[in-house]
């Protein structure tokens, strides 16, 4: 059977084109020895949990790219960002409206925080593929549960279906709620004019994106972008710290 290293080496040397994540597609442009870049928080290299120098500059560049108020670089994937967003926006015992096609990390956050969940279903086509979340369905849920604190949806879906974030955000905000968008497969949205707008600029309050899925960054890299002040930034930071490793990889961070 051989070792995992043997199998990875054989795959890398094959003529197989990687039609899968990560987005760098085994690009050899950044041909480095990973051990040279694998360090810890030493003088001059900042701290991802308390960025004040070179990593603060990186987060500010992410802010400019996505037009976000604040951004958090993540090396535990969108999983940690989703759990942080849900935890920051909804207190234990409060209610969240969550789309049934959501990533399991959102459900894990609901379980860990003991949040009350209500569900909304995406429209499906004849092939059974999950489609968009309809704004009217969210309005109906608010009519039934007026105490919904946050709405969690996925846009784009794994199949590339995009919901009307602007209309959904307007509805959620009119009821005093927070809109969290899992945009894990849409980190390229808003970059140039050939892609849909990013949810940050469409009114979403917290957006989580996996840089490694569609952009040339290493697996596990992601960002949490804040689009408004509806959730206390100190609380968001607290939960990103809780859910992310205290030994963040500089190799992963550098690939951002």
Positions of PLM-derived features:
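Short glycine-rich, polar/acidic loop-and-turn segments at beta strand-coil junctions
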Residues: 25, 77-78
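Conserved PLP-enzyme active-site core in the AAT-like
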Residues: 2-9, 30, 68, 78-255
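N-terminal "arm"/small-domain region of PLP-dependent enzymes with the aminotransferase-like
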Residues: 1-53
């Amino acid at each position: 059977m051989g070792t995992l290293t043997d199998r990875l080496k054989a795959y890398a040397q094959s003529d197989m084109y990687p039609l899968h994540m990560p987005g760098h597609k085994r690009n050899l442009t950044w041909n480095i020895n990973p051990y040279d870049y694998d360090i810890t928080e030493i003088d001059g290299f900042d701290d991802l949990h308390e960025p004040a120098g070179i990593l603060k500059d990186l987060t500010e560049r992410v802010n400019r790219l996505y037009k976000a108020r604040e951004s958090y670089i993540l090396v535990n994937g969108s999983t940690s960002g989703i759990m942080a967003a849900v935890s920051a926006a909804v207190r234990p015992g409060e209610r969240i409206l969550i789309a049934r096609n959501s990533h399991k990390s959102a459900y894990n956050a609901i379980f860990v925080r003991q949040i009350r969940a209500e569900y909304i279903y995406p429209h499906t086509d004849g092939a059974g593929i999950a489609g968009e979340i309809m704004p009217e369905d969210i309005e109906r849920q608010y009519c039934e549960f007026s105490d919904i604190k946050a709405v969690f949806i996925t846009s784009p879906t794994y199949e590339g279906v995009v919901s009307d974030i602007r209309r959904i955000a307007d509805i959620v905000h009119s009821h005093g709620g927070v809109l969290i968008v899992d945009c894990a497969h849409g980190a390229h949205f808003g970059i140039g004019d050939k892609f849909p707008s990013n949810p940050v600029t469409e009114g979403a309050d917290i957006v989580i994106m996996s840089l490694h899925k569609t952009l040339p960054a290493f697996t596990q890299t992601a960002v949490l972008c804040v689009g408004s002040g509806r959730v206390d930034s100190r609380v968001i930071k607290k939960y990103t710290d809780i859910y992310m490793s205290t030994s963040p990889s500089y190799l992963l961070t550098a690939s951002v």
